[in-house]
Amino acid sequence: MGYEIFWTIKKYDDATFDRAVEMIRIVIDHRHKIDEKKWGICFDAGHENFCIQRNPLEGTYGSCKTRGRFPYTGDVMKALIVMVECGMAKEAGHNEPDNSLWLNSLEMVSELVELKTYSAQKAYFKREPPLAIGS
C-alpha cells in the first residue's frame, strides 16, 4: 500500500537551483545516481524517477506516488525538505497521517546541511492534523 507525496513548485532562478542540487547530492542516498540534464535533474525514486526542473512554471503542482515505505521515499522527502529550504517549493506534504518518515528525513537532512527552516519544518510535521509547509 502506497501513498502520495505532493508539493507546489515556486519560481526560482538558476543559482537557487544549483544550490539545491548541491545540497540534494549531500543528503540523498549515494546509491541513487543523480542524472543531470539540460532541463534539470532526476534521481531514481523506486518505480519512477523524481525530477526537478531547472526553469519551472510558477505554481506547478508535483506529486510522486509510492508503493509503501521503501527507502527511496525518504530521499524524495529529503529533496523536498531542501527545496522548501531553498524557496523552491511550498505546500509539501503527503496523504498519510503518520509524519514519522518526514520527521526522520528532516533530522537526517539537518545533520548533513544547515537548515534555516528547520524549526518551522519540524513544528509543521509535529502538528495534527498535518498542514502544508513552506506556504
Describe the role of every protein-language-model region.
Residues 1-135:
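Acidic (Asp/Glu-rich) sequence patches and key acidic residues
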